[in-house]
């Protein structure tokens, strides 16, 4: 089956499944308790019936991959359309599907040994082992955490993200499957942007948004299915480059036009959110994109010119940079009226200073999984206007898990960019260039824009993105050893 036909079949199944589930859940949206649980049981019963019926017409592997693709698509819906609150934990559609996929995976491991062969064939075992070590370290960190409950909730999110990465990397080991995952991201982004434009034009938001029944002056911010506009903007800062690379590397003129329109839509919505960090991420990604497409001679010139430009900027604006740094991070804290909110830059600087204080106080080991928010709420040294999230992904990792885990994550991130870039230099065909260009630029953009959301740990698209990147590196490495099977 060709890649195009397989993608069309998968996306058709995906659209039908999501549409059916949304219709079913929409019918009982206003009910709670018994009716909500009955609806879940009905969905599961229908799902089991369809799985049983499907096994008669397809192979188990294709069936499992269909579950994986639907799972990937449902991660983009977050908890916007359906959620079961179990007190300390909530079940969303993608969490139910992740549990189902996990059970099917374990059942398959018991039945045959193909999973061992899959594992031996992986070219990214070290990266997966780092994520496993991260989770184990998080468990150990509960020994000194102030709040074990908060730590367990955080580790549950971390475990789901890591297990999702493992599933995708284990089963997406062919270029055909990788392109389907890429296509799912592109299609689901269109769906989320439609909701975003609806928010922006009508000033109506989904119940999962903080702007639902929020202040009138914020109603024009698009949030789509996300908690707030910053989360949505960070997501779009990734999708923007996927559309740009699609426009560049696909020869079909209609698809090029669609890619251009969708990239402009994503850029407009980022402007509409007012997220400065996401705009900086876009600029950083564009700068890197221009660099990687330059000829080798011009690349060297670009590096020297960039270094000279940065040095000149630092010299010309050294006093202003230092004074601003002093004002935000070194100057003694000044009192302000509790009736007035802190300026956003001062509040964010205080969040970083608090996190740094907690990190030093823990001797570099971190305050324990998820506990930086607990510390900000109960032990903040600097005023944050009662904000209890760091608003910086790398600093969040540093404060929660310590220096070693943060440097490990950053090293893995940089290593993935480097490997993708080295593959890009090998003059790949358009399909692989689309993947490498899109992922490199999106990774740079996300690294910058990740200072915008309050926390990245609960943004599941981050784990989908990391799974896509790691799976791409694995596929490209395997294609170097066994080129034919990877591109069938």
UniProtKB/Swiss-Prot annotation:
It comes from Bacillus subtilis (strain 168). InterPro entries: O-antigen_ligase-rel_domated, WaaL-like. Pathway: Cell wall biogenesis; teichuronic acid biosynthesis. Induction: By phosphate starvation, via the PhoP/PhoR two-component regulatory system. The keyword Signal does not apply. Coiled coil: none annotated. It comes from the Bacteria. The chain crosses the membrane at residues 7-29, 35-57, 64-86, 91-110, 122-144, 154-173, 180-202, 222-244, 257-274, 279-298, 303-322, 354-376, 397-419, 459-476. This is Teichuronic acid biosynthesis protein TuaE. Pfam families: Wzy_C. Might be involved in the polymerization of teichuronic acid repeating units after their translocation to the outer surface of the membrane. It is found in: Cell membrane. Keywords: Cell membrane, Cell wall biogenesis/degradation, Membrane, Stress response, Transmembrane, Transmembrane helix. The keyword Amino-acid biosynthesis does not apply. The nature of the anionic polymer present in the cell wall of B.subtilis depends on phosphate availability. Under phosphate-replete growth conditions teichoic acids are present, whereas under phosphate-depleted conditions, at least part of the wall teichoic acid is replaced with teichuronic acid, a non-phosphate containing anionic polymer. The synthesis of teichuronic acid is accompanied by degradation of teichoic acid and reutilization of liberated phosphate for other cellular processes such as nucleic acid synthesis. One of its GO terms (cellular component) is plasma membrane. GO terms for biological process: cell wall organization; teichuronic acid biosynthetic process. It is a multi-pass membrane protein. NCBIfam families: TeichurnBiosyTuaE. The gene is tuaE.
């Amino acid at each position: 089956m060709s890649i195009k036909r397989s993608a069309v079949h998968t996306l058709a199944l995906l659209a039908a499944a999501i549409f059916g589930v949304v219709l079913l859940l929409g019918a009982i949206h206003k009910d709670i308790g018994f009716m909500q649980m009955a609806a879940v049981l009905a969905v599961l019963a229908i799902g089991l019936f369809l799985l049983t019926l499907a096994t008669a017409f397809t192979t188990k592997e294709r069936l499992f991959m269909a579950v994986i693709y639907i799972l990937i698509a449902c991660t983009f819906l977050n908890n916007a359309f359906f959620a079961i609150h179990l007190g300390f934990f909530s079940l969303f559609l993608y969490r139910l599907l992740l549990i189902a996929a996990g059970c099917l995976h374990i059942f398959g491991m018991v039945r045959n040994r193909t999973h061992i062969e899959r594992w031996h064939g992986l070219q990214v075992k070290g990266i997966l082992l780092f994520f496993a070590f991260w989770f184990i370290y998080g468990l150990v960190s509960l020994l000194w955490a102030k709040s074990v409950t908060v730590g367990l909730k955080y580790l549950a999110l971390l475990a789901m993200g890591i297990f999702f990465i493992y599933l995708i990397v284990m089963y997406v080991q062919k270029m055909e499957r990788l392109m389907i995952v890429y296509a799912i991201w592109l299609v689901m982004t269109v769906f989320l942007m439609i909701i975003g434009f609806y928010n922006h034009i009508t000033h109506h938001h989904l119940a999962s948004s903080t702007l639902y029944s929020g202040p009138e002056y914020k109603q024009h911010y698009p949030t789509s299915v996300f908690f707030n506009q910053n989360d949505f903007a960070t997501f779009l800062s990734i999708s923007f480059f996927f559309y740009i690379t699609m426009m560049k590397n696909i020869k079909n003129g209609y698809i090029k036009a669609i890619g251009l329109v969708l990239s402009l839509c994503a850029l407009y919505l980022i402007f509409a959110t007012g997220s400065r960090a996401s705009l900086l991420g876009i600029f950083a990604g564009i700068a890197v994109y221009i660099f990687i497409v330059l000829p080798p001679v011009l690349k060297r010139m670009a590096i020297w010119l960039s270094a000279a430009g940065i040095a000149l900027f630092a010299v010309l604006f050294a006093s202003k940079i230092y004074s601003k740094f002093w004002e935000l991070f070194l100057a003694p804290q000044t009192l302000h009226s509790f009736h007035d909110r802190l300026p956003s830059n001062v509040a964010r600087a205080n969040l970083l200073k608090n996190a740094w204080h907690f990190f030093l106080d823990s001797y570099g080991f971190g305050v324990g999984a998820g506990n930086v928010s607990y510390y900000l709420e109960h032990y903040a040294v600097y005023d944050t206007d009662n904000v209890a999230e760091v608003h910086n992904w790398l600093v969040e990792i540093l404060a929660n898990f310590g220096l070693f885990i943060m440097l490990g994550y950053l090293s893995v991130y940089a290593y993935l960019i480097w490997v993708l870039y080295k593959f890009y230099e090998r003059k790949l065909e358009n399909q692989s260039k689309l993947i490498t260009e899109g992922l490199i630029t999106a990774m740079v953009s996300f690294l910058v824009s990740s200072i915008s959301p309050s926390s990245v740990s609960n943004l599941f698209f981050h784990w989908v993105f990391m799974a896509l990147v790691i799976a791409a590196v694995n596929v490209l490495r395997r294609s170097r050893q066994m080129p034919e099977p990877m591109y069938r």
